[in-house]
């Protein structure tokens, strides 16, 4: 199985966090859990970017056939678009890591409520609770539609 197909928890080598009875939300153990996940995710993206650069350098061939050259250019273009998306994701991961340092992590940017451990394990960069995210998506559809 490639690293890209692993879940974030598998990638970080952690199990789903098990809350203990009366455990405080976003305590040091939980912060460490999410820091591991975010650092592993960041590292994976850096590795993918390095592989892309190496692949593009290895694959540069001056094809005499215009169709072959166009195919290669399209493949490179797709890879570069993917890397651009990942670059933006890396910035979001880095911003989330900073939130871990300032005790802002895990709380909704809109209403201040807890985002929840399971939601954060699925999407550690989430900055809205599920209710606020749902409302934001509804508003977005109304504006677009």
Curated annotation (Swiss-Prot):
TM helices/strands, residue ranges:
none
Pfam family name, one: DksA_N
What would be an example GO MF term here?
Answer: zinc ion binding
A GO term from the CC aspect: cytoplasm
Which InterPro entries does the annotation name?
DksA_N, DksA_RNA_pol-bd, DnaK_N, Znf_DskA_TraR, Znf_DskA_TraR_CS
Location (main, coarse)? cytoplasm
Kindly state a single biological-process term from the GO annotations of this entry. Answer: regulation of DNA-templated transcription
Q: Does the keyword ATP-binding apply?
A: no
Provide the protein's localization: Cytoplasm
Q: Which UniProt keywords apply?
A: Cytoplasm, Metal-binding, Zinc, Zinc-finger
Amino acids binding Zn(2+): 108, 111, 129, 132
Q: Where are the zinc fingers (dksA C4-type)?
A: 108-132
Q: How does it assemble?
A: Interacts directly with the RNA polymerase.
Membership in a protein family: Belongs to the DksA family.
State the name under which the record lists this protein.
RNA polymerase-binding transcription factor DksA
The species this protein belongs to is: Haemophilus influenzae (strain ATCC 51907 / DSM 11121 / KW20 / Rd)
């Amino acid at each position: 199985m490639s690293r890209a197909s692993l879940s974030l928890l598998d990638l970080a080598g952690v199990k789903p966090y098990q809350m203990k009875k009366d455990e405080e939300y976003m305590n040091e153990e939980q912060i460490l859990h999410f820091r591991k996940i975010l650092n592993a995710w960041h590292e994976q993206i850096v590795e993918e970017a390095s592989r892309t650069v190496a692949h593009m350098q290895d694959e540069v061939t001056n094809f005499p056939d215009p169709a072959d050259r166009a195919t290669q250019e399209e493949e490179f273009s797709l890879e570069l678009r993917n890397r651009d998306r990942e670059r933006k994701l890396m910035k979001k991961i880095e911003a989330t890591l900073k939130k871990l340092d300032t005790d802002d992590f895990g709380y909704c940017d809109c209403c201040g409520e807890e985002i929840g451990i399971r939601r954060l394990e699925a999407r550690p960069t989430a900055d809205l609770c599920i209710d606020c995210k749902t409302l934001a998506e509804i508003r977005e559809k109304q504006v677009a539609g």
